[in-house]
């Protein structure tokens, strides 16, 4: 079945897209084969949430604007020369221009609106007319690797929660959350890796079943009583996907006087039209109402979010460690009259910012060969190059044992400024000498230390009050372009929705060449260095010390850095 409109063909149930494997090229070089394979990988049915609709994750986060645009992007990448650059505007290939061999092969801008018009209402009107596409973060930038992409960040957060609130011991404790989509689906596995049990409330049964199949959740429950019994009846951490609505289950726990140890949420609350099921509605009713009365859906969804947030606040008052996990649900509740919605913190200022100050964030890579052995060899190389980090080694061991690859084999690994370029150069050398069967691509989430401005998430509560300053991700994208990343993206609205974030991404191909080594050395140093720069500029001492140790040239801070011991 296909569905076409002014938007072009957005639904085609006859299509199954998978990235090519092996060393046979469809494009003219690995520098254009890499974005081709990663675009296709984003739409692999083992990777994407709704591949037939081009939706990768995060509500309506798409890889291409419509199927006509997808086909044309593929066609262009197959013919693109190594001195040309393809421009993609909100999922639509709009131009090919002469550049040079060290320039990016693809430059992408997704979902960007002039600030006064940067809201869901205006975006949705443009989207209906086929003029825009929501790229989320890694959906429209072609570097989504399935739920693994956020597992380690979520794991690091839960480990930090255990350290801060429970003396580092999560045994016998449990987390309540909502949402098992592409991002939220990482929560159950991350929680059990960190030693917590978890009840994850999800209204779409197919998503629970998918997480069961891929090993991200342990069990499914149809009632709250059943879920509570499951986590009580075990000596080991266990995760349960509970079929229900978070706006119903969270208040029910308050009513029953049952207080989880930790409370958070990863529903797609950032998009009230497409991402959150109103209380009392069926999935079918919501789908029908989205066609008939969008305003009513948004109104009902935001009212339901307010109910959920009030319950989260009540549970916080009763002693639960409560945190916002970056979906902007507090903002939605605030707009619905929950004046104290921001009384519980976001996860970045509460637990992650010290890592950002050292440029540490979600470094990821994928094996274009399709062979898992290439990833296992790179895992070992990471251990060799970073021998004195048992926490990182433990993560890599757990990842190999417990994480199922989705699509092309890939790995996520939080490392910082002092290590990223070293790892990239080592991977490139492994390709050069034949240790790996084909090139590797290295990218990251847009959720990183220097690549995002998001006052309700990554840049919440900055020391100098610069939460909303979005010059930083723009500079990051420009620098990665100048440095020669293979493709660079600049997006708006990812994670927290329209009007609340701007962010940039980069991917670089390790094809084993000497030219690639030069590009890798530049890009994988500069990219995390912008994060250290951004946090040092905001006044964070950890970032200043890192800048001094890594010999960054920060003109307004150099005199101060020179005095640090």
From Swiss-Prot:
Determine if Lyase is one of this entry's keywords: yes
InterPro entries for the chain: Urocanase, Urocanase-like, Urocanase_C, Urocanase_central_sf, Urocanase_CS, Urocanase_N, Urocanase_Rossmann-like, Urocanase_sf
Enzyme Commission (EC) number: 4.2.1.49
**Cofactor note from UniProt?**
Binds 1 NAD(+) per subunit.
Q: Where is this protein found?
A: Cytoplasm
* Record GO cellular component, one term: cytoplasm
Where this protein primarily resides, as one coarse class? cytoplasm
**Keywords recorded for this protein, A-Z:** Cytoplasm, Histidine metabolism, Lyase, NAD
GO annotation (BP), single: L-histidine catabolic process
Q: Name one Pfam family in it.
A: Urocanase
Q: Which family does it belong to?
A: Belongs to the urocanase family.
Tell me what this protein is called.
Answer: Urocanate hydratase
Lineage here is: Bacteria, Pseudomonadati, Pseudomonadota, Gammaproteobacteria, Vibrionales
